[in-house]
Amino acid sequence: MANILRKVIENDKGELRKLEKIAKKVESYADQMASLSDRDLQGKTLEFKERYQKGETLEQLLPEAFAVVREAAKRVLGLFPYRVQIMGGIVLHNGDVPEMRTGEGKTLTATMPVYLNAIAGEGVHVITVNEYLSTRDATEMGEVYSWLGLSVGINLAAKSPAEKREAYNCDITYSTNSEVGFDYLRDNMVVRQEDMVQRPLNFALVDEVDSVLIDEARTPLIVSGAVSSETNQLYIRADMFVKTLTSVDYVIDVPTKTIGLSDSGIDKAESYFNLSNLYDIENVALTHFIDNALRANYIMLLDIDYVVSEDGEILIVDQFTGRTMEGRRFSDGLHQAIEAKEGVRIQEESKTSASITYQNMFRMYKKLAGMTGTAKTEEEEFREVYNMRIIPIPTNRPIARIDHTDLLYPTLESKFRAVVEDVKTRHAKGQPILVGTVAVETSDLISRKLVEAGIPHEVLNAKNHFKEAQIIMNAGQRGAVTIATNMAGRGTDIKLGEGVRELGGLCVIGTERHESRRIDNQLRGRSGRQGDPGESQFYLSLEDDLMRRFGSDRIKAFLDRMKLDEEDTVIKSGMLGRQVESAQKRVEGNNYDTRKQVLQYDDVMREQREIIYANRRDVITANRDLGPEIKAMIKRTIDRAVDAHARSNRKDAVDAIVTFARTSLVPEESISAKELRGLKDEQIKEKLYQRALAIYDQQLSKLRDQEAIIEFQKVLILMIVDNKWTEHIDALDQLRNAVGLRGYAQNNPVVEYQAEGFKMFQDMIGAIEFDVTRTMMKAQIHEQERERASQRATTAAPQNIQSQQSANTDDLPKVERNEACPCGSGKKFKNCHGRKSFS
């Protein structure tokens, strides 16, 4: 272990020596740049662009370009990047993560690699965790970029598509991580090229990269459309039922936060819903509602997992930042179950039209880099998932903060008494204090206790995060007491007020350890910026969530020996700190495994999504007749239909092929079984294809010009692709839930998901081509079709998709359940295109 640690340290030192060498070269240009006039310095941007066009690489331009930005920052902002900031900028340009402590000037550090990469003209995205930071950084640092002749855009959720397009077309675009992701998904749902807003993804520099790429990695971005639902009463009934249960009627597994009915609970459910057997197959839907109601009532906690807004909306609370996640909903009906629990309006369930995880979203950039003060603990994940190294950057001044040993109390009550007493003592002498909590509930509790103690303070949590930047900015003033949920206000520096250094600087008090060491380090890092004095102190109790769920037997045995009889007894031990860290490592390992599994599943969809989106983009951007593509689909559809009956009785095969041709290709009277008998399969395929081509030409002749033909072809393909893709996403989601159970049968769920997902994708492609063929051949096309197509193109909304899906099923001829499907798939009608009708 010691050898491994030594090797890691030596590697870091070697990397720092390389960075320092390049940084010195950047510094060597300082006098030269300082001697230039404003006009000459500004002219360097055009010079760099020309040199890049002539073949110089960005790496060759780096020393001089970084020097230009340093001088520009000095003239425009009055700030001159230190050597350690230059080193951080080099790491960012290389597509890695410089670990820079709080207050070391990460925002200024980013200006150098952002400027350099913008020279290539392919766009640079600076990603922040909220719109306040996007707007702030774009406004402040944008002055430097604009002065140097680069355009800067801010992408906000409220902007129109035209405004977003303008922002993305700038050299540098500031945006939140969620908005970039949603814009990508929406771009792949439009039916006209002019409605797209993004350019190809080039370089992303992510601020607070651990928050975006690690903490939010488990939460997919989902674009969904409403699906009419009559199930609200079931949510309410299930909620009413579980509220009648006592603690013996359900079983909770605390470490995994799962819950299920006990035997007595099952008996009560069967009695309540008048069932003979709750787990009969026809009751599967009901058990799903009951499971969600159990989770909502006994696992999901108000003010910890979610809050209820003033207008009665359930808002998810991000467990890592303490902020509410606007627009996000718990999936799989859990959100509706919580709405039933809290007695607010139950919103309709939705059907996913497009989704992507942050992991796969950001891996699509040509180059990805990020900044944070705390990433070393997640180094393995950054390397394996994103191919990014973590390079710790030295501080410009030595850290003067004192980190005190953790204090452990027997109960929550005794711990909070000690916290209030500590705050009272420090506040009396004027020392500013930041109290960090992991939940809104704890913030409110401590706030009430401080009010009782007569201590004025500010509370910063998920309920008032609009004021968070202002509150955090004042947290370093003399006598200030601030309670902050987790890492609320992250990204805003706490600067010490006058006379505070002499009082010991800002004191950070942690009210419990978070399950992630990184979050604890972030809280500590709010104090002691740029060599300022400061202190940190964590208070723990045996009743803390982390200690209850993951406290080891060694801790319990140690505490038994200490005989904690007195409620206010406190333990201060290095061994305790090591055991807590060990528990945190276990949790981090569990969370990493979960994120890894999410990625493995999403990688299956990623490959399929990229194929669909690439083909979609080809259709949207095509300014030509798409006839060759449609004819190829027709040919493959005919081939599949004929091949599906190759092994059947010859008479039955011919009859089935004729049925397929009449329902999907040609007018009913234009083909008969008689003319196909005696022909070989290849001859039948060719005959049907030639007939289909004649019909195809007849159909297009009804459109008045080439422009109308191209528009009709595009809308036809895109509408069908979008319908089938939406259905496929839903099917993959159901498959994922189903294969999860196969782990109990010693089968690898991910491998099964990959295999079955691939087969389903092939089936979907066949279904797309069949629907394009049938619609092309059978559609009633009139002269005004172009106007109708154009109108449909501007309203490609999920509700249109729903009606289109219904229309497709209704167009099928009357076929009995167990007959072969006329699409030629070889499946029974009830298992193919008839599935939706019968369901």
Curated annotation (Swiss-Prot):
Cofactor-binding details, from the entry: May bind 1 zinc ion per subunit.
Biased composition, class Basic residues, residue ranges: 827-839
Compositionally biased tracts (Polar residues): 791-809
Membrane topology, record value: Peripheral membrane protein
Reactions performed catalytically: ATP + H2O + cellular proteinSide 1 = ADP + phosphate + cellular proteinSide 2
Residue numbers spanned by region Disordered: 780-839
Pfam families to which the protein is assigned, alphabetical: P-loop_SecA, SEC-C, SecA_DEAD, SecA_PP_bind, SecA_SW
Listed GO biological process terms: intracellular protein transmembrane transport; protein import; protein targeting; protein transport by the Sec complex
Enzyme Commission number(s) of this protein: 7.4.2.8
Chain sites annotated for binding ATP: 85, 103-107, 493
Residues the entry annotates as binding Zn(2+): 821, 823, 832-833
One Gene Ontology term, aspect cellular component: cytosol
One MF annotation (Gene Ontology) recorded for this entry: ATP binding
UniProt entry keywords in alphabetical sequence: ATP-binding, Cell membrane, Cytoplasm, Membrane, Metal-binding, Nucleotide-binding, Protein transport, Translocase, Translocation, Transport, Zinc
Location(s), subcellular: Cell membrane; Cytoplasm
Biased composition (Basic and acidic residues): 780-790
Cofactor entry: Zn(2+)
Similarity section: Belongs to the SecA family.
Function: Part of the Sec protein translocase complex. Interacts with the SecYEG preprotein conducting channel. Has a central role in coupling the hydrolysis of ATP to the transfer of proteins into and across the cell membrane, serving as an ATP-driven molecular motor driving the stepwise translocation of polypeptide chains across the membrane.
Subunit structure: Monomer and homodimer. Part of the essential Sec protein translocation apparatus which comprises SecA, SecYEG and auxiliary proteins SecDF. Other proteins may also be involved.
Stated name of the protein: Protein translocase subunit SecA
Lineage: Bacteria, Bacillati, Bacillota, Bacilli, Lactobacillales
